[in-house]
Amino acid sequence: PALIPFPRV
């Protein structure tokens, strides 16, 4: 679970 929501495309 990432602490910061990164847009993984």
From Swiss-Prot:
The PTM Valine amide maps to 9
Cellular component (GO) terms are: extracellular region
Q: What is its main location?
A: secreted
The biological process GO terms on file are:
neuropeptide signaling pathway; regulation of smooth muscle contraction
UniProtKB keywords: Amidation, Neuropeptide, Secreted
Q: Where in the cell is it found?
A: Secreted
Annotated family: Belongs to the periviscerokinin family.
> Main role?
Mediates visceral muscle contractile activity (myotropic activity).
Which named protein is this? Periviscerokinin
What taxonomic classification does the UniProt entry list for its organism?
Answer: Eukaryota, Metazoa, Ecdysozoa, Arthropoda, Chelicerata
